[in-house]
Amino acid sequence: MAKQRVFVLGLDAVPPSLLKTLKGGIPNLTRFLETSEYGPLESTHPPITCPAWATMATGKDPGELGVYGFRNRTGPGYDHLKMVSSRDIQAPSVWDLLSQRGKEVIVVAVPPGYPPKPVKGYFVSCFLTPGHKNSFTYPEDFKEELLKISPKYKFDVMNFRTPEKERILKEIYELTDQHFKLVHHFLKTKPWDFFMFTEIATDRLHHAFWKYFDSSHPKHDSASKFKDAIPDYYRYLDSLIGKTFELLDDKTTVFLVSDHGSKAIHGGIGINEFLIREGYLVLKQEELKKNLLIEPTLLVSPCLPAGNQNHVIGVSPEIIDWKKTRAWGEGGYYARVFINKKGREPEGIVLESEFEPLKLKLREKLQAIPDENGNTLDTKVLFPEEIYPLITGIPPDLMVYFDNLNWRAIGTIGYPSLYVSENDTGPDDSNHSQDGVYAFKNSQTQKKKVEGMKIHQISQKILEVY
């Protein structure tokens, strides 16, 4: 019997519509898609890199994983927020299960992949890696071999939300080149039965250059010298993918997947500004004044005390009056709202009998927020218990997709209105969309359009090959 091999190529943040638009400039990808089982891949709720790739690898949804974004509450305290790592994924990944079966596996840059996990084969950590001084390969001694291939091996594009577009673009190409150089080295020199690789540079490209590409973007700039940044990069990426496919034999089963899509970002809505204005979040005025010794902006906010209305600040626990606060929020791709529940939070004030009515009232108010011109937004407010059969960890009480993720959530305060034109972490052109890409091909595959594939189904489909 022929040896069963599976190669999974992950492209972060690629929507099906993008590959369709670029069809003429990406011949290798187009050829693959036109001879495969292909369709949209519904992402997790929320559609964020972490937890989406972990769900793909384990078959477990964010509720089962206890991972609701890049930062997660680890305890009842107000400051118990921790960046996700591979240690947080307790469910076995497909490479864990295959390692247990004696299969040789290679995993490269699949988030959350730091610190590296022991496998029967090789594991190279992802963009969460702090730097070369840290252990980022398994086995550890492979690090020396990797650095001989790429002495300045990159894990990510640093500070990709910045006006430094030329620097970002240069680093995107460097990152991609180094990743594929490593992948090709593995394919040529190491034994494997299962290989999974994720390219994060596509996500960074979209965040930095989407407005130059997407004519529907509210800040579309077709005259910019970066107007071809996205199609040019995908032509380059396609050439590397073509070289990768040449290193695979015809008996290899190939998956092409993305964890979520991308779309134009229209701006940001201040979740904590909203909660303050509605009386749900109360700040300590004296502590607030102490925290205003920071770089000022030219903004004015009714949420800040008189004489200090020219600053944007983060809402840290020490400036919140918890004895008067019923809810607070965290910004990001989506808004996370936590209720200050008595008996759960250290200084909770919302009684059990008030908890559900407050959630419903907040949902009603959040869904009623219009855009800056008074137009209705398609805001979705989800309760974790409505979307996850099992809940572990500490999820938000409300998950808010402003205008179905056309707007980001802004956690900082100090703006003249609820609406901001830029992400509060830096210039950003795109937010995430729900559908990524799914394509599957083996020696028997006939071209087939598929609908309804969900990201948690991928791990089982991989295991079925063996």
Residue spans of the language-model regions?
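C-terminal accessory region downstream of the catalytic core in glycan-modifying enzymes
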Residues: 32-37, 110-112, 348-373, 433-466
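Secreted, luminal/periplasmic, and some membrane-associated catalytic domains
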Residues: 2, 11, 70-101, 108, ...
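Active-site-proximal alpha/beta segments of enzymes that process anionic O-linked groups
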Residues: 3, 16-190, 200-207, 300, ...
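Histidine-centered active-site/metal-ligand motif
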Residues: 203-207, 216-218, 260, 427-432
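A structural signal for well-ordered alpha-helical segments within the folded catalytic domains
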Residues: 27, 51, 89-96, 177, ...
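A long, amphipathic alpha-helix that forms part
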Residues: 169-191, 195, 205, 211-255, ...
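Beta-strand elements within well-structured catalytic alpha/beta cores of enzymes
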Residues: 3-19, 32, 56, 98, ...
